[in-house]
Amino acid sequence: MRCPFCRHDDTQVVDSRVSEDGAAIRRRRRCSACDKRFTTYERVELALPAVVKKDGSRTEFDRRKIVASMKLALRKRPVAADAIDAAVARIEYQLLASGEREVRSEKLGELVMNELRQLDTIAYVRFASVYRRFEDVSEFADVIEEFRRAAPAKPPRKR
């Protein structure tokens, strides 16, 4: 594997271990030329369905896009990176289990919203506001009211 720092193609694996979610192997590598260390992840490559966009065009499923959009929604929220990876893995599993060769972008967005709903309600509202193209405050209020109806009553916060 090439070193990302000096582009030399001779690197050694210093340490290998299974990631916390068990879906990847984490490897620490050292470049023999510049002696810098870096981390790589090895995952099984699966045949995920193509994504059909709203305009009808098709594109490959890109895990990085899902992770990036979830991280944006979760920005400055107390959610660990491992939890995001696990959520994306669940989305991928659902897509694989469906057996479909294509998935509409709307369906993919709904899967992301379902995962965000479980991770962090603020992130869910952020993502939903962009994904569903909220146009006024009442749409935010409707989503928040959904949560109030679904969530059990919490005792008042002590200050």
Curated annotation (Swiss-Prot):
Example GO biological process: negative regulation of DNA-templated transcription
Pfam short name (any one): ATP-cone
PROSITE patterns: ATP_CONE
ATP-cone domain mapped to chain residues: 49-139
GO terms of molecular function: ATP binding; DNA binding; zinc ion binding
Keyword Manganese in record: no
Family to which this protein belongs: Belongs to the NrdR family.
Protein name: Transcriptional repressor NrdR
Organism in which the protein naturally occurs: Burkholderia thailandensis (strain ATCC 700388 / DSM 13276 / CCUG 48851 / CIP 106301 / E264)
UniProt lineage: Bacteria, Pseudomonadati, Pseudomonadota, Betaproteobacteria, Burkholderiales
